[in-house]
Amino acid sequence: MGKIKIVVSDQQPFMIDGIIGFLGHYPDLYEVVGGYKDLKKAIAECNKSAAQIFILGEFAGGMMGAELVKWVKSHKIDAHIITFVAKMPYIDSIKLLEAGAKGCVWKTSHPAKLNRAIDSISNGYTYFDSVHMDCEKISSRYSSDNQLTNRESEILQLIADGKTNKEIANFLQLSRKTVETHRLNIMKKLDVHSGIELIKTALRMGVCTI
């Protein structure tokens, strides 16, 4: 597998430089093909370079959150969007998902979370920063015929944290097949058919906050 191509865009040049500098510590993993204050130029670079990841920052006096993601997606880019934003009340995680974002990382978070977001999304998963889930609260939302077990609740938390089946298996000391079975059971109980729907449902239930 080759390097992951990344484009960065933010209204603040020092933020762009900071992200590029951080990702530069991993030359074998990432190739930053451009960093732009001008959003239209960033989108053009995504299309020109066939970037896999677009780290989308904030822009004053205009669109924000899901509205901004929709506008970027309207330009038909193939890159997966990670929003890189300040932790603010206007950020609605469900709307970000529905708009087409694959992840969100807070600017106040540890830089390692940006690594996790990029790696998770590149492997077909979503990643939303600071997802905290209350396993007891999850279980209390269900009647006895479809209640999640404690193990299923634990796995749902790890899925929402952006962990892959393999990572969950290693963390819980289970086989990958067992984790896959639990995941299918969770999706059946919640009546969802994709990873994105799974996270959306958890958010709507109020069992996690982003």
UniProtKB/Swiss-Prot annotation:
InterPro entries: CheY-like_superfamily, Sig_transdc_resp-reg_C-effctor, Sig_transdc_resp-reg_receiver, Tscrpt_reg_LuxR_C, WalR-like. Residues 141-206 form the HTH luxR-type domain. GO terms for biological process: phosphorelay signal transduction system; regulation of DNA-templated transcription. The keyword Oxidoreductase does not apply. PROSITE patterns: HTH_LUXR_1, HTH_LUXR_2, RESPONSE_REGULATORY. Gene3D superfamilies: 3.40.50.2300. PANTHER family: NITRATE_NITRITE RESPONSE REGULATOR PROTEIN NARP (PTHR43214:SF41), TWO-COMPONENT RESPONSE REGULATOR (PTHR43214). Residues 165-184 bind DNA. The keyword Ribonucleoprotein does not apply. This is Uncharacterized response regulatory protein YgeK. SUPFAM superfamilies: C-terminal effector domain of the bipartite response regulators, CheY-like. GO terms for molecular function: DNA binding. Residues 5-122 form the Response regulatory domain. Keywords: DNA-binding, Transcription, Transcription regulation. It comes from Escherichia coli O157:H7.
